[in-house]
Amino acid sequence: MNTNNNSSGSNGPTSNSASSMYNYTHFKDTKYKNAQGTPNRNFQPVPYTEEEHQRIQYLLDKVLGPEYVSFRPGGGGQKVSYIEGWRALNLANEIFGFNGWCSELISSQVDYFDTHGNTGRISMGLSVVVRITIKDGTYHEDFGYGYIDNAKNKAMAFEKCKKEAFTDGLKRCLRCFGNVLGNCLYDRTIISKIQKVRLPAPELEADNFHRDPLIVQREMKKKQTVGVNIHESAENNTDNTNNIPKGNDDNGATNSNENNSNNVHSKQKNSATSLQTPISNRNFNIPNSTSQHRDNNTKPRASHPSQPGGPQQHSKTSSNNTPAPKNYDIVGDFDDSLVFSDDLPMDDDEMSHNDGLDDYELQMLIHKNRQNGGTDDPALIARSSYAENNENSNSSGEVNPTNNSVQEIPDQPALFVSAKRADALQQAPKDATKIPQFDAKYVSPNIRRTLDHSKSVPVRRSEISQAPHDKPRTNIGPPKLLNRASPGPTISNSNTNNLGKRMIGLPPSQKPPYKRRHQDASLSQRSKPDETSQPSSKAVPQDTNPSKDKENQPARVASSKNLEDINNMAQVT
């Protein structure tokens, strides 16, 4: 350990021009330590009791669990096990108590301090000696080391090295007390077992957080306010259900029922198809016990036929044929949103008021009633049609107390028929059994089929190539050059795909021959005398003998044939 001091007597670096290294003196301050290096403060050790001694010894003999051990890559592709500094401090507080141990920095020394040229980067290494003392006076000392390479400045280098060195010395001192403080990490058998254990991800709970008391108090008040509001809303709901009046079963609805039932109105739809019984005629009867159920044995409503005789007569029949008030038994606690909803379900009798009419039929009835001088009220029209249907059904002797207007037609089975038979089936649906059904599996003998469509099997390529309708296509090769003139190659429009590209414009057979850009030197020389024969005839007298002209004519024809052959070759290429 280097203990050289500078000339001023204070702790500081001594320059060394040879190695550019700074050596710091040993930490010795008379304020904290005396000349012998022992603490100058008054320390009174307190011995452990027998129970405390056994408890601490029992905990120190245990082995660290896998949640306390960490791994980092080491040399040779191996992993190095270690315990993190904050975990070691928590274990020391758990075993010795938060006031049962203390740590001291005994000495600090800079091993090397290098500056890298003009870059200002710093590399240094620092070692410290740390002592840990427990309550009964037992202590352990060990060294710690910290280093850094290429630090930006001195402050960063010293901060990192001192913290790393002190933490390293602290962990090395604690491991001297027992296995649970890190000494078990040097046993490879224990490490091999720890590596096989897989831990679940840690879950943090709200109770484990240390919160600000003011924030916690605000959150508690907010929760209480929300709870009170929910409780008050629940009480209001129960009060509203208890305030629903009881209906009068014999004499109809009372005045109070009418006032309350006006609030319970059905949803008024934009279309005229919403023909429901007015909600004012409904009575809600709340039983005293929760075991009472709805009475399903309701009497069918008597139908009174009406005779269409004008608008006044329609209004009378509508007032006389108002349905009897119904009692809805609401059992026990119920939700207000169900009772005071706009979408209350209709009974069978109420559904019969619509008479199975859709929008189109209802509009037709309104239009017809206008022509007859009747009313435009869709409810009255629907009720009149309902009464007429009841009258017709009663006259025929058929009685249906629940739904007299709608006569269900038995469902006909689905049939497959041909297009010719479809019109006949629509005109006479009762004769569906007489019409022959269409056989979807019928195979016409006039259509040649190369594959069996009745089953799903893989098709080989050879079977497709041997199909009877696939005829081999012959590739048209270049035309042979003959001594006589021959037209260019003709390509049919059906086999244009054999050309290998998409043809645009006229087909090749109708295109004009390509322009001959290059000509043989011999042919050009051979054709020159023929072309220049006319100008030369002016200077030389021509022979008028026809026999000589006939002798010269085949030579000219031969030369023209040669030119046509050359044109054909150019088109092929």
Swiss-Prot record:
The keyword Transferase does not apply. Residues 1-20, 228-330, 388-408, 446-573 are annotated as: Disordered. Its main location: nucleus. Transmembrane segments: none annotated. Residues 449-473 have a biased composition (Basic and acidic residues). Coiled coil: none annotated. Keywords: DNA damage, DNA recombination, DNA repair, DNA-binding, Nucleus. GO terms for biological process: double-strand break repair via homologous recombination; double-strand break repair via single-strand annealing; mitotic recombination. It is found in: Nucleus. Belongs to the RAD52 family. This is DNA repair and recombination protein RAD52. It comes from Debaryomyces hansenii (strain ATCC 36239 / CBS 767 / BCRC 21394 / JCM 1990 / NBRC 0083 / IGC 2968).
